[in-house]
């Protein structure tokens, strides 16, 4: 699948 940016809590 297409690459994605994993959402990480700051």
UniProtKB/Swiss-Prot annotation:
GO terms for biological process: blood vessel diameter maintenance. The keyword Nucleotide-binding does not apply. Disulfide bonds: none annotated. Keywords: Bradykinin receptor impairing toxin, G-protein coupled receptor impairing toxin, Secreted, Toxin, Vasoactive. GO terms for molecular function: toxin activity. Its main location: secreted. Helokinestatin antagonizes the vasodilatory actions of bradykinin at the B2 bradykinin receptor (BDKRB2) in a dose-dependent manner. This is Helokinestatin-1. It comes from Heloderma suspectum suspectum.
């Amino acid at each position: 699948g297409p690459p994605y940016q994993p959402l990480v809590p700051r």
